[in-house]
Amino acid sequence: GEVTRAGLAPGTSLTLLAIAVDDAGRYGKVMRYSCSTSVPSFNEDISIALSVTYDEKTANVKVSSNGAEIVRYYYFTGEVSSSSWTRVLGGTRESAEEYMAVNSDNYLISNTDEKPLTDGCIVMDDVMMNEEHVAVVMAEDVNGRLSRAHMLKFVPELDLGDFVYRGKTKWLSTRPTVTFLSCEEEGDFYIINWKVTPAAGTTAYTICTHPNAMEGCQTPEELAVRIYNTGVEVVPGKIESTQYGDKANLVYVTWKDASGNFYEPVSFAVQ
């Protein structure tokens, strides 16, 4: 038989005790075997530099290195609050380095053979704006030795422009129209269909969700960012739909004008 212990840290010592039992129920001698997991040999000469720029809902993490010929990079990206970062990779540079060094084939860890850099960058799509993110990168040289991990934490900020508040003339003149099309019971949920018609020259974002999902938004600006992050950009004429709705849900809408100024959101009770 074979005994496997996965997810162990480098340099972990283990002792295996085993005993055999025959058909008559008689025990044999206790067998003892000690072993330890290997400790990676790092190339301390490799240095990595990371920097980040942002597009709309996209973060581009620029990767560069020197000190050795590099054949590939291994990297992890995600939100600092995610369980992948806090629980699996341990939430620190040191713990992430330890994990990545022995689990480079884990689905959480990407490499540039499978996901090449784009113009020298790791491209993070659909990032949550105004939330802290982390990128951890390790390089592998031609001899198969890894560099030390380099970590970059960053918060991609959504530019709200000159925020326009409820009741202002510009707010009133650009407020989108929301039309409820149906609310059909489906088991324990409701299928809710609605349509948003933005004013000319504006782009709207919408979501249908329970008010509890918006708890923690203390200001109109925070609510606008939450809708932008978790909702969808409105395509004029398209019917929006949620499959697991509740009659207590609200439809939230925020919008921005051609100058990039966001507007205080509105909400509508499901009809």
Regions found by a protein language model. Give the residues of each.
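Extracellular fibronectin type III
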Residues: 23-42, 142-164, 259-271
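Solvent-exposed loop/turn segments flanking beta-strands in beta-repeat/beta-sandwich domains
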Residues: 64-98, 196-220
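Structural beta-strand segments of beta-rich domains
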Residues: 57-61, 190-194
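Extracellular recognition modules
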Residues: 15-21, 134-140, 250-256
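Surface-exposed, short loops/turns at beta-strand junctions within beta-sandwich domains
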Residues: 4-13, 110-117, 123-132, 231-248
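Proline-enriched interdomain boundary motifs that mark the N-terminal boundary
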Residues: 42-50, 161-166, 171-179
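Short, solvent-exposed loop/linker segments at the N-terminal edge
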Residues: 52-57, 182-188
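Solvent-exposed serine/threonine-rich low-complexity stretches and specific carbohydrate-binding patches
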Residues: 87-115, 217-233
